[in-house]
Amino acid sequence: MESQRSFFIIVFLIVSFILWKIWDDEHHINLLNIENNHSTLQPYSIQSHESNQNTPITHTNNPYSHIITIKTDVFLLKINTYSGNIEEAYLNNYQENLNSQKPLKLLHTSKENKYQAYIDIETLNEYFTNDLNQKNKKHYLYYSNTTNQCEYILKNNENKLQFDLTYQGPNNIIYTKRYLLNRNDYSIYITYIIDNQSTYPIHIKLYGNLIQSIHSDVIQSKHNDHCPLYTYQEAAYSTDTEKYQKYNLKDIKHTNLNIHSTNGWIALLQKYFIIALLPITPKDNTFYTTYLNNHDISIGFKSDFIHIPPGKKNELQSILWMGPKIQDNMKLVAPNLDLVIDYGWLWFISHPLFKLLQFIHTYTIDNWGISIILITVIIRLIMYPLTKAQYTSMAKIRMLQPKLISIQEEYKHDKYQYHQKTIELYKKEKVNPLGGCLPLLIQMPIFLALYYMLSESVELRHAKFAFWIKDLSDQDPYYILPIIMGITMFFIQKLSPTTITDPIQKKIMNIMLVIFTIFFLWFPSGLVLYYIISNIITIIQQQVIYHDLSKKGLHNKK
């Protein structure tokens, strides 16, 4: 087996797999447009226990609706006092796109493209809603902040920001919705405090919902910065029995989720960002999905009813996580939440590779491009013994080519004898015909794991490298890196010994070079950089190995 031919065949299979994965991700699901549109504030209703789904309703010119602005080091939030929920959320440390100074808008309520998270309560005794129709005898659920402030800011000398929204219900039942935000933390702790000062017991249920618009067309998100490597933009959940499970949004229309669990979380996923709800107390919850209004889906949780006697208080707690897919942060919030970083079936390799990349970035130069170069060098040096074994085995097989051709000519009419004599020759010369292929096959999972790791890392989003490369997660705007990669592949082919004499096969090899280069035109710069460095190392290792083989009489390039 010729070295360059085996290399290109396996690379071709890998690239084909990657492209199939991209196509499947783009066409199997409805990608969701979460473009930063001008939003209209739309509070959502709290449903009665008789309803099976939490359907949002719209209110315009609501006299009870006031907006409170929350500013921390990582968040800019806008909370509607009429629902007590977050209407808009911005991530201060992430921009909409590379050329924008505007913070990334993660939650919004535009009619066409909803992307929302809300947490509410309902009771058996009182039905709260944002519906102002008094004929239905429904109580208003509007809050007032205890300090009458319109803006809360986390000061530089503070590590946490806490504020309360209160609602005075009928019969002296006081409802407090408490928000707690910590510095450098994408977790928002939301606690309902129900003070039953009435003369009768009440029963309270906590529920939360994540809502997202879906469309019939495949819509590409601007938040992906036109990167062609889409990952699973779907819902996900974790329960007592399933550590991590993805849930196809389009399946919600036909099959609703309904799972009881005492632990877990629900989430909506983007390529680099996530919103998740984690019920803390009560422990017993049901995770469910709902198809809304022919174009919105909801994944949510609802607790069992809890009993609050007269004169008693109770607290219902949950966590809303909104932010980037940062492994170290998410695994501290909830078990298995870090699994939303989709490393595919090679996660057990990708995860330690990311830890190594993170270590290199932390303790060397503060440049993710340099870190990619260093991790590539380290991996290729570790795999050098396999590379040398591969080239040595191929060299031995090349030295046997004259004898193999002679056997083929002698037994061309007797396939059985031909195979027998070939095997005998391999045994006599102590050559494994698969010796050149097996080391390469062992290396391929590592290369694929690196691909998954680099394509999933939010750390590379808008990360500068050098010169014209301003975003390692986006394609090279001038296609210089893909062209350089194509040149390195050309040198690998030309410097590799070959016995191919068929001009058609030579043309096919050259065409494959062009095809691979075209494939990589739209790949993220970080991935292309990795392949360039890997190819350069391959060229260097080739020359070192061939020089050593020449001394042993095993290399004679034609």
UniProtKB/Swiss-Prot annotation:
Its main location: membrane. GO terms for cellular component: plasma membrane. It comes from the Bacteria. Keywords: Cell inner membrane, Cell membrane, Chaperone, Membrane, Protein transport, Transmembrane, Transmembrane helix, Transport. GO terms for biological process: protein insertion into membrane; protein transport. One of its GO terms (molecular function) is membrane insertase activity. The keyword Cell inner membrane applies. It is found in: Cell inner membrane. The chain crosses the membrane at residues 6-26, 359-379, 434-454, 480-500, 513-533. CDD domains: 5TM_YidC_Alb3, EcYidC-like_peri. It is a multi-pass membrane protein. It holds the Pfam family 60KD_IMP. Gene3D superfamilies: 2.70.98.90. Belongs to the OXA1/ALB3/YidC family. Type 1 subfamily. Required for the insertion and/or proper folding and/or complex formation of integral membrane proteins into the membrane. Involved in integration of membrane proteins that insert both dependently and independently of the Sec translocase complex, as well as at least some lipoproteins. Aids folding of multispanning membrane proteins. Interacts with the Sec translocase complex via SecD. Specifically interacts with transmembrane segments of nascent integral membrane proteins during membrane integration. This is Membrane protein insertase YidC. The gene is yidC.
